[in-house]
Every structure is written in structure tokens, then in C-alpha cells.
Amino acid sequence: MGKSKVLIIGGTGYLGRRLVKASLAQGHETYILHRPEIGVDIDKVEMLISFKMQGAHLVSGSFKDFNSLVEAVKLVDVVISAISGVHIRSHQILLQLKLVEAIKEAGNVKRFLPSEFGMDPAKFMDTAMEPGKVTLDEKMVVRKAIEKAGIPFTYVSANCFAGYFLGGLCQFGKILPSRDFVIIHGDGNKKAIYNNEDDIATYAIKTINDPRTLNKTIYISPPKNILSQREVVQTWEKLIGKELQKITLSKEDFLASVKELEYAQQVGLSHYHDVNYQGCLTSFEIGDEEEASKLYPEVKYTSVEEYLKRYV
């Protein structure tokens, strides 16, 4: 497949910076939207300069200046948005509606990847827990705008980010694995799908000029990474040579604890409920033509066990 000109929005963020690296690594001419809102955030500025030194182009543009967005979009074939959808950080999913309008105005984009990268909102609109459902609702608003505008798209469903889920052994609010005890959600046997964020970026970039992924949802669900919480914990125990004390948290007690939290945390915990208590991520079948590790067998993805080794 040929190389593309790729514009990445949110290129200094948690996933965005990985998308930039993956785009450069795969040989695409990579542009990063440099927003004035970055201000004097020296870490982000230094990251942008680092990417520039690696060959990326910095393009000035702002969601407050529609024409600047249009001009930035006109430079490329592919637009990827990595705008944050996490309420405990900055939640800006609907900001992408301006980007959709800019892409429509420019008229030259061959593929748009909006900020998805989690669970597929189309699959869980009727079952997602409130208030976490707001994230899915907003992603569907963006999807409908994309499709109404006739913009070629790929939606990437990446399931669970390893850094957030595996690092804390699937416990909310923990990003380092314990060597003493672990809270098990329910019976701990609901399976979920965990992906290294670098792998997510690699797969996402693979899709951008692949005709097989045009106007489709692609799921990153590699077989070795479909595990229950208990299986994740067992993998960790094997690595450290020690069995953890296990404390069971019932669904009822979990829901009661959620009510005591601030709204942003309630949103995040709603997603944990859907994943850990409902098993939503493995509640439907995925065809080989929709699954990233089947589409791109040349990518050596990081297994759960390999990922957890960094914490030993």
C-alpha cells in the first residue's frame, strides 16, 4: 500500500503521541495540529519539537478558528483525531463536530479516524450504564455527522488500554499492580480485551489506506489478550511467584460506592462496570475481516503476560 499524508489532532496526548510515532514509523508524511491552546505547556512543546526533529510537520490551527482547520485538512489525505474522551481529564468528543465540518469543507480527505479507540458505542447504546453512557452517546453523534457528510471513515475499537486496566490488575484508580492483595469484581470471570497502547496506534495507522477497512469498524481483539480479571491476576501471580489475597466486590457494593463519587469518576466507573461486571466487550462475535490481528498478522502484538513483565 502507498504512503499517505496524515494529520493527527491531539498529537501530544496519551494515545495521540503514539499515533504520531506509528505514522512516522510506517513511513507516512505526518502532520500534527499545533493548537495555540497549548500555551506554555513546556512538556507538550518539547514533544512537538521532538516529533518535528523526527520528520513530522507542525501545522498551526485551532478549533476556535474554522478556516485554520480547513487549511490544515487541505494538506493531507488522512485525518486522525485523538481528542480526549476521558472525563477525569479533558472531555472534548463533541469538539470533533467542527473537525467534521472542516473535512467536509476541504473536500479532499480520503479517510477519517475519529476519536474512538475504546468500546464500540454502536454495540452498547442500550445496555451501557449511566452516566458513562454519555461518552458513547457523544461518539454516536460524531459518527452520524461523519456519515451524513459522506466522509470516508474507519472506526477503531481498541477495547481496554493496558496502562489503565492491566497496570492495576483491572482495579479502578490503580495503575500499578499490587504484590499483596487485589479486589475482584464479581466472580472475576467476565472476559475483556486488553491492548498495549503502542499496538493500538500501530494497528490504527495500518487501517488508514487499506481498502478492506473503508467505512467499517475495526476491532483490536488479539486472541492472547482476551482474559478475565482472574486470569490477569493469575498471570501476574505467576510472574512474581506469589499468590495475592483476593477480596471480592459484589456488583451491589460496587454500585453503592459509585454513587458517592464525583460525576467524572462516576463516568469512568460506569465503563468499569460494563467491562468487569457485564462482560460487554466479549458479548458479540467479530469476523476475521473486522479484527486487526487477523487483518495484519505481520504485527507482533504485545500479549498480556509480556505487558505485565514490565512491572516485575
Swiss-Prot record:
Optimum temperature is 30 degrees Celsius. Coiled coil: none annotated. Substrate binds at H271. It catalyses: (+)-lariciresinol + NADP(+) = (+)-pinoresinol + NADPH + H(+); (-)-secoisolariciresinol + NADP(+) = (+)-lariciresinol + NADPH + H(+). The keyword Oxidoreductase applies. Keywords: NADP, Oxidoreductase. The active site is at K139. Reductase involved in lignan biosynthesis. Catalyzes the enantioselective sequential conversion of (+)-pinoresinol into (+)-lariciresinol and of (+)-lariciresinol into (-)-secoisolariciresinol. Abstracts the 4R-hydride from the NADPH cofactor during catalysis. Belongs to the NmrA-type oxidoreductase family. Isoflavone reductase subfamily. This is Bifunctional pinoresinol-lariciresinol reductase. The lineage of its organism: Eukaryota, Viridiplantae, Streptophyta, Embryophyta, Tracheophyta. The gene is PLR_Fi1.
